[in-house]
Amino acid sequence: MSDKIRIGLLGTGRIGQVHAISIDENPNAELTYTADVFVEGAKKFAGQYGGKFTNDPAEVFASGEVDAVVVASPTPTHVDLINAAIDAGVHVLCEKPIDLDITRVDALRQKANSAKTIVALGFNRRFDQQFNEIHTRVQNGEIGNLEQLTIISRDPGPAGKDYLAVSGGIFRDMTIHDFDMARFFVPEIV
């Protein structure tokens, strides 16, 4: 029996590839299952990174072969996949945003708060050294009182047409990081 965290990857698109590489490079983790409605993508990932593949995420949850899943599928699938993971007792790292309907997000938050599993969101900037330094200095009062916060973000290049169709574009997909950074630096809603 392995001491590695057994991870299922749900979604083999742009961010799924990033997660697959990270899992592959982590000596404490192994990719045991990949699921994507585009089964050829899942098959390719399984061939490249190991584990089984399927086009049905329910198979991943029923397998008993995952300790955690990374939800890297299109946004409209996130709530259902997180709910399925919680029901299966599987930990979750979900890409942002969870959903565009605040009612669904609130219901999921309540369920996640009472679950025995960890549900985390992919707000990676909170773990960036420079952002953490700013956060610490703000919290310690070294910078003073923040009265205005300007965040400028750029994507390295334009996203493809297929990606834009399911991602919601730059505003929904990337600007959410800026909102999270604003909350990270200034946790009080004004």
Residue ranges and their predicted role:
Residues 1-49, 183:
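N-terminal Rossmann-like dinucleotide-binding module
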Residues 19, 51-111:
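Beta-loop-alpha module in the N-terminal Rossmann-like domain of NAD(P)-dependent dehydrogenases
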Residues 33, 68, 148:
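Short, Asp-centered acidic motifs that coordinate Mg2+ and/or phosphate
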Residues 42, 81, 108, 134, ...:
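Aromatic/hydrophobic pocket-lining residues that form π-stacking "cages" and hydrophobic walls in ligand
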Residues 44-51, 111-115:
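Short, conserved SAM-binding/catalytic segment
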Residues 99-159:
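A contiguous active-site-proximal alpha/beta segment in oxidoreductase catalytic domains
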Residues 159-190:
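Rossmann-like dinucleotide-binding domain that binds NAD(P)(H)
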